[in-house]
């Protein structure tokens, strides 16, 4: 579901396309106890434009099902790789 959302919503930045920039951006974020996403940041970037697009698309994702610890909702950290590849 997450990958389907990303593939439909990522827009390859024009400057990156023009300069033939591609690579993998790793975005770190937290899923809160209510399923919302917070504290989105790039932990491994490629270029400012690909990094910005990765952050934008992660922030636009719908709420997740919250994680649980011992049956209780818990705040969970994720690292999500987003691959930008020119076709």
Would you name each region that the model predicts?
Residues 31-32, 37, 68:
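Short, acidic, Ser/Thr-enriched surface-loop or helix-capping motifs
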Residues 30, 45, 79:
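Short loop/turn motifs enriched for small/polar and acidic residues
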Residues 34, 45, 83-87:
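Short coil/turn motifs at secondary-structure junctions
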Residues 13, 32, 43:
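Residue-level recognition of the GNAT/N-acetyltransferase active site
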Residues 43-50:
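A short acidic/small-residue loop/turn micro-motif
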Residues 1-27, 53-87:
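Short proline/glycine- and basic residue-enriched helix-capping loop/turn segments at helix->loop/beta transitions
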């Amino acid at each position: 579901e997450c990958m389907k959302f990303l593939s439909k919503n990522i827009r390859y930045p024009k400057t990156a396309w023009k300069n033939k920039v591609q690579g993998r951006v790793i975005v770190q974020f937290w899923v809160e106890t209510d399923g919302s996403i917070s504290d989105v940041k790039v932990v491994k970037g490629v270029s400012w434009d690909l990094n910005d697009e990765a952050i934008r698309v992660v922030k636009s994702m719908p709420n997740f099902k919250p994680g649980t610890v011992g049956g209780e909702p818990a705040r969970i950290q994720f690292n999500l790789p987003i691959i930008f590849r020119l076709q």
